[in-house]
């Protein structure tokens, strides 16, 4: 029996890896072996960073809310506690958006939080 080198199946597999490696620098987008290693690493980075992105955005929202809260004479934690006491359920993403785009509305929320903290 003649030896079979893989042919069609192997070519398809290599082509798939090289397609994923498109845009990489140097030999990493032309040579299969180095492309395969880089593609594997890239997929690991993508997996990790899809989870990291959620944490990064939450940090950003909290930073923005804290800055706006301090302009209104409250700390972040006191603002959030005051809103909870006032039974105002607004998530951090929306609060951060208000802090950046609608300062008057955010100031009203901060006043409500202050009132509920004092009572």
Swiss-Prot record:
Annotated Gene3D superfamilies: 6.10.160.10, Ribosomal protein L20
One Pfam family hit: Ribosomal_L20
Q: Sorted alphabetically, which PROSITE patterns does this protein's record hold?
A: RIBOSOMAL_L20 (PS00937)
- List, in alphabetical order, the Gene Ontology terms for molecular function in this entry: rRNA binding; structural constituent of ribosome
- InterPro entries cross-referenced by the UniProt entry: Ribosomal_bL20 (IPR005813), RIBOSOMAL_L20_CS (IPR049946), Ribosomal_protein_bL20_C (IPR035566)
The lineage's top-level taxon is Bacteria
Gene Ontology cellular-component terms for this entry are: ribonucleoprotein complex; ribosome
Q: Does the keyword Transferase apply?
A: no
The UniProt entry's sequence similarity note says: Belongs to the bacterial ribosomal protein bL20 family.
Its function? Binds directly to 23S ribosomal RNA and is necessary for the in vitro assembly process of the 50S ribosomal subunit. It is not involved in the protein synthesizing functions of that subunit.
Entry-linked PANTHER family: 39S RIBOSOMAL PROTEIN L20
The identity of this protein, by name, is Large ribosomal subunit protein bL20
Native organism: Shouchella clausii (strain KSM-K16) (Alkalihalobacillus clausii)
């Amino acid at each position: 029996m003649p030896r079979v080198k893989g042919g069609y199946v192997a070519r398809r597999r290599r082509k798939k890896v090289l397609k994923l490696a498109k845009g990489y620098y140097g030999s990493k987008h032309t040579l299969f072996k180095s492309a395969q290693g880089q593609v594997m690493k890239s997929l690991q980075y993508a997996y990790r960073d899809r989870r990291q992105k959620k944490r990064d955005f939450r940090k950003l929202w909290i930073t923005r809310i804290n800055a706006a809260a301090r302009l209104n004479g409250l700390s972040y934690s006191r603002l959030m506690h005051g809103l909870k006491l006032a039974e105002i359920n607004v998530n951090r993403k929306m609060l951060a958006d208000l802090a950046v785009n609608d300062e008057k509305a955010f100031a009203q929320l901060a006043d409500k939080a202050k009132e509920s903290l004092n009572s």
